[in-house]
């Protein structure tokens, strides 16, 4: 409806998509051992462009609700498991995949002397921080901004020394 608030629109969307871990009857297993070639390509390409142009770039991992200690309320809002499919992956698969990508990015930045900020371990997986699997609530966005500003400040302070 035209008079819906942004919060009501989001809630309406979540209710139509949510609880995919329980609602989708078809369960598939996907346990990649490496990040996708496309992800590797684009991260590498971005890093090369940063160095070539002498940009100060920051690489940031992706916080998600995919944690063992995810709140029951947030877990019911999961829909990106994957999105728009008739099947779901298990929470264990989702944890493994998100950890694989976040750990790969951390290692890549260390090995290539790039700035890295870790968010994934700093946001509790609950509805105070997330609307759903990976989208921040307003409060979560504020926490992300604070964490990132501290990370950038720390990195800049180190480069001055």
Language model: regions and residue ranges:
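Conserved beta-strand segments of alpha/beta enzyme cores
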Residues: 56, 113-115
């Amino acid at each position: 409806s035209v008079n819906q608030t942004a919060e009501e629109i989001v809630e309406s969307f979540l209710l139509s998509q949510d609880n995919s871990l329980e609602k989708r009857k078809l369960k598939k297993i996907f346990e990649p051992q490496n990040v996708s070639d496309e992800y590797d390509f684009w991260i590498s390409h971005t890093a090369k462009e940063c160095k070539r142009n002498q940009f100060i770039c920051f690489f940031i991992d992706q916080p998600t609700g995919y944690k063992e200690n995810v709140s029951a309320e947030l877990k019911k809002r999961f829909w990106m498991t994957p999105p728009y499919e008739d099947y779901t992956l298990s929470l264990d698969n989702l944890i493994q995949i998100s950890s694989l990508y976040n750990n790969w990015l951390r290692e890549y930045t260390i090995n290539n002397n790039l700035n890295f900020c870790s968010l994934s371990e700093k946001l509790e997986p609950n509805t105070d921080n997330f609307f759903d699997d990976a989208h921040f609530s307003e409060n979560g966005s504020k926490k992300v901004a604070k964490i990132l500003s501290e990370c950038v400040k720390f990195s800049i302070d180190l480069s001055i020394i």
